[in-house]
A protein has these predicted regions:
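Short, small-residue-biased leader/transition segments that mark boundaries at the very start
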Residues: 1-7
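Alpha-helical interface subdomain recognition
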Residues: 12-15, 20, 28-29, 36-182
């Protein structure tokens, strides 16, 4: 389950040795170096989750316009309209939050708080948008025949990568306290 929208293969590396001149950074400090890039990683994850939500939304909206029930396209039903509206609101909010974080990073403003907020909100909302898209498709939405289902699987996985949603709450909580208690 997951990684349905990407090609993946395995690579095994055993007993590898390299010259000190080939090291990136300092030997034994890999995790500390990696931590410096977590915030950027979170933005990249957010961008991918947003893309999944947008793809699922596009497919759901097209399907709702084409699928006919009771002699009318299903988008004319209020429940479908509400779902599409809520999905679009989430997508717009995700875009705004991601663009804000990217702008802050580009302008050398700390994104420790905002990247955690973005990661938690965008990955959670993307999964919700994809879930609603699956619902609009009905039974076929649950199968991997629809892109919406594959998007849901991948978006759900983004809630773990780069730090779980629970870890994002921990990071954001500490930063919020610092922000308001200067």
């Amino acid at each position: 389950m997951g990684s349905e929208m990407c090609i993946r293969d395995r690579m095994y590396i055993d007993n590898v040795e390299c010259d000190d001149s080939c090291l990136v950074g300092e030997c034994g400090k890999g995790f500390l170096q990696l931590m410096q890039n977590f915030e950027i990683e979170r933005l990249l994850i957010c961008a991918q989750a947003l893309g999944l939500a947008e793809a699922a939304m596009e497919d759901a909206a097209k399907y709702a316009a084409q699928r006919v029930q009771f002699n009318q396209p299903i988008y004319k039903f209020q429940q479908i309209q509400q779902m599409l509206t809520d999905m679009e609101i989430k997508i717009v909010n995700m875009q705004n939050l991601l663009y804000k974080c990217a702008w802050e990073h580009d302008n050398n403003i700390s994104i420790r708080l905002d990247s955690a907020l973005a990661k938690r909100y965008i990955c959670k909302s993307a999964t919700e948008v994809c879930s609603d898209a699956m619902q609009i498709f009905g039974g076929i939405g649950y199968t991997t025949e629809t892109r919406a289902s594959r998007c849901w699987q991948d978006s759900r996985g983004w809630q773990f990568a780069g730090g779980t949603n629970e870890v994002m709450v921990h990071i954001a909580g500490r930063q919020i306290i610092k922000k308001y208690n200067k």
